[in-house]
Amino acid sequence: MTGSSIGVAVVGAGMAGRSHAAGYRTAPTLYDEGLPEVRLVAIADVNQAFASDTARRYGYERAENDWRALAEAPDIDVVSVVVANTLHREIVEGLLAAGKHVLCEKPMAPTVEDAEAMVAAAEASGREAGVGFVFRRSPAIAAVRDQIASGVIGRPLHFNGHYWCDYGVDPRAPMSWRYKGGPGSGALSDIGSHLIDLAEFVCGPIRSVRGASLPTVIAERALPLGAAVGHAAAELSDKTEPVENEDLVTFTASFASGATGTLSASRVAYGLANSLGFEVFTESGAATFDLARAGEFGFIDPTPAGPGQGYRQVLVGPAHPYLTRGMPMDFPGVGYGQNDLFVFQARAFLEQVAGLDRLPRVASFGEGLHNIRLLDAIAASAKNGGADVVVD
């Protein structure tokens, strides 16, 4: 920390970068216990206009067009890295070497080698380093996890999850870094990494995968004439380039607990902008979650006893993780969404940096490395006709 305050910055001014910027802005207002003063210092992006607009919008002091300016700045302590994952390693290693605490967006890196190097850099730096698996901060998902971990409904038997989006369903969607990088770097890496971490968060570690398929359904895309943010449409040029990675992924997972999982992720799910959901069935119960109804979850437990009872609706509130005194209105029925999760995540990481121990820590770089190994295993299964692949 810089004296008695924490200076924060964000690398990347796209939609996820803006989510981090907004999260840091609101995080100090959560809970009764105070943090040190949080200073909103800088937004960096190679597109200066994007950086300036995001800094203005969220109240940051300045905008930069190079992440190195953040590394060199003595008034910055914490940096979120929210750019294409092919750029993560250089930026993260540079920031850690400069003494910054780093929260890196998922997926942590494009390769296991890069992720291992980032883990080593974090360990050598002695700084806090975390990975942005933001769905761990969902009160409803964390409540389901707690019910399973406590043994209330027994061990998990089957997890069925999906993350379906439609940002790539239009053939006129412009070419971007999301469509480059080879098999495993598309829908699997971009949104599947979230789903995989969520599955392990709820059911424990995955030991092997099989039956993976990584099809590409739109073979080429037009280059944009100018810069585009996130999944936004853009004016297109006459030049096209081939899509190098998958539009969707399906696979089966075996968990260390003995449970089986069926998972799918897609960026070409027509009409579904951001559909994340799962069901988990256990020895004596079940739970279900739908991100479109993020302020609730469905639950079946042994009371009343007997099959056929169906799900009962549970509205999240002060009895569930992260919520007590966490929002101006924290009672059931208020409702929470994905944007709120970035606030909870920012608060947790700031507390880690401040040396506080009141909230579950964000995912570690070691956990981020494990996620990359899982992505590799799924890609290997697909490459080998759906073979069973053990996760290293």
Residue map of PLM features:
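Beta-strand-loop-alpha-helix segment that lines the small-molecule cofactor/substrate pocket
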Residues: 78, 84-85, 89-137, 151
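Short, conserved SAM-binding/catalytic segment
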Residues: 54-60, 121-125
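Glycine-rich phosphate/pyrophosphate-binding beta-alpha loops
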Residues: 193, 264-273, 337
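N-terminal Rossmann-like dinucleotide-binding module
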Residues: 1-58
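C-terminal glycine/acidic-rich active-site capping loop/insertion
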Residues: 134, 218-246, 250, 254-255, ...
